[in-house]
Design a protein with these regions (language model features):
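Active-site-adjacent helix-turn-beta-strand microarchitecture at beta-sheet edges
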Residues: 135-136
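Nucleotide/phosphate-binding catalytic cleft detector across ATP-hydrolyzing
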Residues: 1-10, 16-129, 140-145
Length: 145
């Protein structure tokens, strides 16, 4: 099966397409669009222009996924939508325009998923993981993995 994962970040919106079978997965495509959503924040709120940029990118990713015959698309937002005053309105507007539901991750979930994604491929038993995004930084110290 194939699945599209979208990371709706403060500066970039990234699409990754994976082929997976059970616990095994393989990256087929990684596309990044410089959207600069952080630049559309005015008085703590994402402007209509910023929402429109997000909608355009998500719509183009949805079309790309249909070319790959991928029907499953999961969209996650981090600080880009978490740290604005109109999170609910932005998520609703994106859904209304694109039909895409955006899940806004809290800081703890973002850090846990970043950690899981970072240690899965390499199996490093002890370390410090730094996830540096456009609008947030998560640090995770771990040992005996």
């Amino acid at each position: 099966m194939m699945c599209g994962i979208v990371d709706l970040g403060s500066n970039t919106i990234r699409l990754s397409i994976y082929q997976y079978e059970g616990e095994h997965f393989r990256l087929l495509l990684n596309k990044k669009t410089m959207a600069g959503l952080a630049g559309y924040v005015q008085d703590g709120a994402l402007s209509d222009g910023g929402i429109l940029v997000a909608c355009r990118v998500l719509s183009s990713y949805r079309a790309l996924l249909s070319n790959f015959s991928v029907s499953e698309m999961h969209v996650f937002a981090t600080a880009s939508l978490r740290n604005i005053s109109n999170t609910g309105e932005a998520v609703e507007a994106i859904r209304d325009v694109t039909g895409v539901t955006v899940e806004v991750l809290d800081v703890e979930t973002e850090a846990a998923l970043s950690f899981k994604g970072a240690v899965l491929p390499g199996g490093v038993p002890t370390g410090l993981l730094a996830d540096i995004g456009g609008g947030s930084v998560e640090l995770v110290s771990y040992r005996d993995m």
